[in-house]
Amino acid sequence: MSMFNKVVKEFQWGQHKVRLETGEVARQASGAVIVDVEDTVVLATVVGAKSAKPGQDFFPLTVDYLEKTYSAGKIPGGFFRREGRPSEHETLTSRLIDRPLRPLFPEGFYNEVQVVIHVLSVNPEIPADIPALIGASAALAVSGLPFNGPVGAARVAYIDNAYVLNPTRDQLKASSLDLVVAGTERAVLMVESEADQLSEEVMLGAVVFGHEQMQIAIDAIHELVRDGGKPEWDWQPAPKNEALIARVTELAQNDLLAAYQLRDKQARSAKLKEVYAATSAKLEEDALAAGTVAADKATVGNVLFDIEAKIVRSQILNGEPRIDGRDTRTVRPIEIRTGVLPRTHGSALFTRGETQALVVATLGTKGDEQIIDALEGEYRERFMLHYNMPPFATGETGRVGSPKRREIGHGRLAKRALVKCLPSADEFGYSIRVVSEITESNGSSSMASVCGGCLALMDAGVPMKAHVAGIAMGLILEGNKFAVLTDILGDEDHLGDMDFKVAGTEQGVTALQMDIKIQGITKEIMQVALAQAKEGRLHILGKMTSAVSGANTQLSEFAPRMITVKINPEKIRDVIGKGGSVIRALTEETGTTIDISDDGVVTIASTSSEGMAEAKKRIEQITAEIEVGQVYEGTVLKLLDFGAIVNLLPGKDGLLHISEIVNERVKDINDYLKEGQQVKVKVIQTDEKGRVRLSAKALLNEAAAAAQSDTPPQQ
């Protein structure tokens, strides 16, 4: 009899066979599930603390997605030959898994929960993110933790006007859409996508298609729980302190109402801090007078937050102005300035209300491309977008250093929004880096990065296919009443039920990200949100087009210029030289950057046109073929008894025999030639071994004959 209580569920999911198993591996975790999708295998584990830490006032969920190089049959690079800090892809996938799971834990559950997913085996054609999300959901479901799942997930492509479920990597290359959707049986919770200017109808159809198809995975998880799940935790939320809620409401409600009449963010924040402090102080006085212990500040803060949420939500649903005085459809005032930094290649300052992004574009060569060593193989990225939000952007102090998960995620969203509108490498051979520095933030800084990024690229002279703008939408839903909010503020994001970011052009959507905090968002509500987002996006695009009609026709004087030279691929080694000696000397002496592709295309880049011309000339000389009948101005390298060695081109010498110097007999070659002397010679013979014979007297004879016939000699 086996020592394992192993449970396996298999199902066909689109073009792939999926296997879920639990009960054999990682049995000491609260829950553990292995997911196998056509040889891409992940182990998802969950551990939940049995009790919350004293004073805990938030839900401490961590999700770590870890790729092991052995899964692809590789040994890690680096001195230690082991996996190090998470890659950008691992960080983004961790966020992708976290986002649909977090809303499904019950309110008031503050026990620490850690979800860890290890990628154990990789089929290069099957991305591991969907198996990882399914595995994390299944591990939570079998663990017995209080979790309102399970969650399903699916990737959707759009190929030849048809949706494709969980496409392979090859299929994705031919797709105009890469969309990941996650949700429960009843509702969509998360969407992440990149698209090639698709309509809102196609995008919504993909979300609905993915939600329908994920039900197969959800059913399989239910079966796994039925046969291999652990007993459900006996957890109940702490009873609400109705007396405290009533007293806090009595003390603070009117002051909170007054605070939310202030339209300026900083004034409003200052007033809210006063209300919080005054309420806590009054409660401490009450406790002292009654001889009891006052409620801790975290508990009081949660009650105050709930009152704030009710105030803001009810005002919006009743048709009253929003926090900053706008109606539900108005975009905040926009100011645009380009060329703001004198020596950068392209720059823009994009301000929308109290959100501001200073965005800079830099052009580089092929050598500046990012080399990514992924499990499925090494590849290069010619477009990079990095997002930074320092603490001063929100008027706070804090840590400054390497990017946090949020910054990496916002940068990737902005990159997704812009990448489909960039020119191809054939049309514009530069590598491109965009950096968005958020200098002010009050909602939707990632979408400000999209707008500013597009403007900075155009300022740098990048011929974008179209202007790209982004907008963040919000939602308030109570029963049958709902309101979709255009261009949400930070407070509206915290107090609302949905964060919905849409970026695109006049033609269609290029990126869509959706995070829904509640269940019950219908297709109709998403339809309204998408239509309202399009209205807002077109408004912003109008402002951007008025400010910058198109890309600059001239690159910055500080940007590198590029020219290309086509050489025989067999000559590449001559240009590179032994140990790179030739190309190294070329780049150092001409001040250029030189990249050579396998097909013989040489790209020369420099800010100096003279340096580029010199590098091009020398490369052409190195790769030139010596032809019989050609005349060269050569340099005497060495004198021999029977002639001279003459250098014609870099690395190419020929023999000028003593009998070919002049017509008369030469007794001493030193009477006619010296080492270092420039001499004009004609190629009279080459052989299969590459040996070259030269003649100077042939040119003398031609000159004499030409003089007699008045025909100019060969030059």
UniProtKB/Swiss-Prot annotation:
- Which Gene Ontology molecular-function terms are recorded? 3'-5'-RNA exonuclease activity; magnesium ion binding; polyribonucleotide nucleotidyltransferase activity; RNA binding
Under Enzyme Commission nomenclature, its number is 2.7.7.8
Q: Which cofactor does it need?
A: Mg(2+)
Query: Does the UniProt entry include the keyword Metal-binding?
Result: yes
Q: Which cellular compartments is it found in?
A: Cytoplasm
Q: What is its main location?
A: cytoplasm
Disulfide-bonded cysteines: none
For this UniProt entry, what's an example GO CC term?
cytosol
Read off the InterPro entries from this record: ExoRNase_PH_dom1, ExoRNase_PH_dom2, ExoRNase_PH_dom2_sf, KH_dom, KH_dom_type_1, KH_dom_type_1_sf, NA-bd_OB-fold, PNPase
Q: Which residues form the KH domain?
A: 560-619
Write down the superkingdom of origin: Bacteria
List of residues binding Mg(2+) = 493, 499
Look up the record and give one Gene Ontology term from the biological process aspect: RNA processing
Record keywords, A-Z: Cytoplasm, Magnesium, Metal-binding, Nucleotidyltransferase, RNA-binding, Transferase
By sequence similarity, the record places it as follows: Belongs to the polyribonucleotide nucleotidyltransferase family.
Functional description taken from the UniProt entry: Involved in mRNA degradation. Catalyzes the phosphorolysis of single-stranded polyribonucleotides processively in the 3'- to 5'-direction.
Q: Please give the name of this protein.
A: Polyribonucleotide nucleotidyltransferase
> Gene that codes for this?
pnp
